[in-house]
């Protein structure tokens, strides 16, 4: 015992020898991590639990979309747009077809413009439902995902009814949309999960047309949003995880080129639907929700309020579309395919259809930039034509790319657990980030 005490006293008498070197360590967050929301690889330099530096690594989902679009006729690249932000499909299509229409000097019929406006907002609600469910799940609130996917499934049925696909719709076309809205909705069939009174209740809103179904949806959806807010907005744990976490000042948001809820959450009222109206946004009434503190909680409140505003817009579009039937595609036969009925009787129509979908059409030489207010921010398409049937250059402006670039500036000084909350409010989808 005396030997141990002598050694201890000797060690304590020489502080230089007892001083240990404390160094930061590096941690790989993702790409195989459920909170990475895809294939994000975030290399974190940590001082204990505190983030000192964050280095995002991207490219793991790069598919060369821009080059693929340059190798095909203009009208054959619409499906590629669906696969960029694969949670906000039709908004991506909208930017691309608007760019083609701008170069060709054509404008979609009024009914098609209202349909596009309506489906842009359906897409916004779908995106935000996915976001609120997955973000809550990241922070431990599991029930919200089940509630959100209940409504999202109904909107997926709307996608399927109008295009035949639940996700990659390819519904928007240069000059209009693929077809008019259907007169009936898909109905649930009897199974071991759905039978009897429960089956009748599920199909009650599906007896009429799609517009009838959407009218019923818009009447009930505000109550559903109230349910999400009951679970989260005043939840003590939710507020502890999001209030004053990931604060982005207005100057920082502008400096990094942020758009959408990320920008509006910092208190900047910028929305392309109001500032640079397209489609029929100048004919509908809606407000722009903005935050005050620029933290994760404000970005949550902005997105929840946006769902309510999107519901208002859909309701107005449904009312107009019910009262105003009409064409949904231009009559310019260089762009619009002939009817299926016409192809059965007319050889010229059949030849025209074949050439349109095999060779496409030549677009006048020029360049344009078209942007839409996608759910995640400004999604833009720069398109250059040299007069051929294929684009000379396609460049896509993805909001998530600009947002992810700011990750290092935003997360410094926060705890590792807060990084999960911040990644969630960034609402990243790597289909558009990596392109």
Swiss-Prot record:
One of its GO terms (molecular function) is quinone binding. It catalyses: a quinone + NADH + 5 H(+)(in) = a quinol + NAD(+) + 4 H(+)(out). PROSITE patterns: COMPLEX1_49K (PS00535). It is an enzyme of class 7 (translocase). GO terms for cellular component: plasma membrane. Its EC number is 7.1.1.-. InterPro entries: NADH_Q_OxRdtase_suD, NADH_UbQ_OxRdtase_49kDa_CS, NDH1_su_D/H, NiFe-Hase_large. It is a peripheral membrane protein. Keywords: Cell inner membrane, Cell membrane, Membrane, NAD, Quinone, Translocase, Transport, Ubiquinone. Gene3D superfamilies: Cytochrome-c3 Hydrogenase, chain B. The keyword Cell inner membrane applies. It is found in: Cell inner membrane. The keyword Cell inner membrane applies. Belongs to the complex I 49 kDa subunit family. NDH-1 is composed of 14 different subunits. Subunits NuoB, C, D, E, F, and G constitute the peripheral sector of the complex. NDH-1 shuttles electrons from NADH, via FMN and iron-sulfur (Fe-S) centers, to quinones in the respiratory chain. The immediate electron acceptor for the enzyme in this species is believed to be ubiquinone. Couples the redox reaction to proton translocation (for every two electrons transferred, four hydrogen ions are translocated across the cytoplasmic membrane), and thus conserves the redox energy in a proton gradient. This is NADH-quinone oxidoreductase subunit D. It comes from Xanthomonas oryzae pv. oryzae (strain KACC10331 / KXO85). The lineage of its organism: Bacteria, Pseudomonadati, Pseudomonadota, Gammaproteobacteria, Lysobacterales. The gene is nuoD.
């Amino acid at each position: 015992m005396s030997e141990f005490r002598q050694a201890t006293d000797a060690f304590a008498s020489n502080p230089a020898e007892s001083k240990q070197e404390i160094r930061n360590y590096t941690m790989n967050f993702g790409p195989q991590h459920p909170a990475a929301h895809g294939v994000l690889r975030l290399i974190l330099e940590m001082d204990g639990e505190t983030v000192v530096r964050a280095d995002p690594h991207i490219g793991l989902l790069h598919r060369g979309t821009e080059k693929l679009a340059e190798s095909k006729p203009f009208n054959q690249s619409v499906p590629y747009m669906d696969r960029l932000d694969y949670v906000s499909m039709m908004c991506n299509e909208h930017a691309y077809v608007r760019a083609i229409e701008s170069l060709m000097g054509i404008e979609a019929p009024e009914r098609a413009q209202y349909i596009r406006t309506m489906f842009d907002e359906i897409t916004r609600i779908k995106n935000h439902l996915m976001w609120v469910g997955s973000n809550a799940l990241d922070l431990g609130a599991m029930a919200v995902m089940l509630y959100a996917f209940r409504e999202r499934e109904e909107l997926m049925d709307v996608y399927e009814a109008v295009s035949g696909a639940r996700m990659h719709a390819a519904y928007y076309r240069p000059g209009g949309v693929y077809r008019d809205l259907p007169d009936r909705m898909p109905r649930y069939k009897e199974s071991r999960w759905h039978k009897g009174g429960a089956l009748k209740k599920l199909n009650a809103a599906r007896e009429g047309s799609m517009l009838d179904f959407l009218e019923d949806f818009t009447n009930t959806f505000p109550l559903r949003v109230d349910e999400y807010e009951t679970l989260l907005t005043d939840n003590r744990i939710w507020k502890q995880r999001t209030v004053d976490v990931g604060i982005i000042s207005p100057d920082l948001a502008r400096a990094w080129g942020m758009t959408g809820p990320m920008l509006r959450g910092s208190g900047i009222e910028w929305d392309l639907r109001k500032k640079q109206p397209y489609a029929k946004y100048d004919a509908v009434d809606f407000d722009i929700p903005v935050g005050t503190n620029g933290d994760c909680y404000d970005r949550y409140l902005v997105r929840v309020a946006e769902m309510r505003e999107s519901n208002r817009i859909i309701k107005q579009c449904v009312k107009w579309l019910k009262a105003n039937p009409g064409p949904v595609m231009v009559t310019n036969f260089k762009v619009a395919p002939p009817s299926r009925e016409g192809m059965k009787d007319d050889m010229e129509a059949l030849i025209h259809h074949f050439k349109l979908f095999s060779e496409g059409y030549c677009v006048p030489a020029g360049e344009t930039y078209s942007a839409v207010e996608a759910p995640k921010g400004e999604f833009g398409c720069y398109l250059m034509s040299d007069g051929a049937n294929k684009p000379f250059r396609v460049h896509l402006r993805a909001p998530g790319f600009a947002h992810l670039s700011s990750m290092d500036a935003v997360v410094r000084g926060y705890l590792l657990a807060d990084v999960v909350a911040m990644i969630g409010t960034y609402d990243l989808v790597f289909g558009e980030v990596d392109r």
